[in-house]
C-alpha cells in the first residue's frame, strides 16, 4: 500500500504570519518629532487646537498680548474653542474606512501565501486614508458636516503682528484669513501614521 506524507511546516508559518498581521493596529496622529520653528512641539499645539483650552490671563501674558495689539486685563479669560479635527475627520471617512476594513476581512477568509502582504497593504491603505482625512480637515477648516470655529479677531491681530515680523508698532495686520487650523501648513504636514504590533 502506498502512503502520502504531508508536511504542514509552511502552513504553520503562513498561519503565524497571517495571525501576526491581523493583530496589528494603525495609528494616525502628529509625528512626535515635528516642531515649529520656535521649538514648540506640533503635537502640543495640535492638542490645544483639537480639545480647546481656557485660562486666566496673567500679568506677563497681559503685557505680551498688549505688545502684540491685543489688550487684555490681568484676570480676564482666554478661551480657544475645541476644533476636533481628528474625530471629525475619521467620522467623515467612516464609509471609506469600512470598505478597506471589509477588503482586509475578505483577504482573511481566503488565505494564500500572499495574505500577510495583502493585510500589510490594507493597513497601509487605512493609514494613508486616515492621514488624508485629517490633513483635509486641517486645510479645509471642516470635516464632513462639522465646521470648526473661525479664528477670533484677537488671534488675527496676534498672527498679523507675529508673522509680519512686527513687535509693537501699529502697522496693518497682514493675516486676514479667519479659517482655523492652518497658517503655514506645519500641522497638516506633520500628520502621519504608524502600524503597531
Cite the ranges covered by each PLM segment.
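Short, Lys/Arg-rich flexible segments
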Residues: 1-197
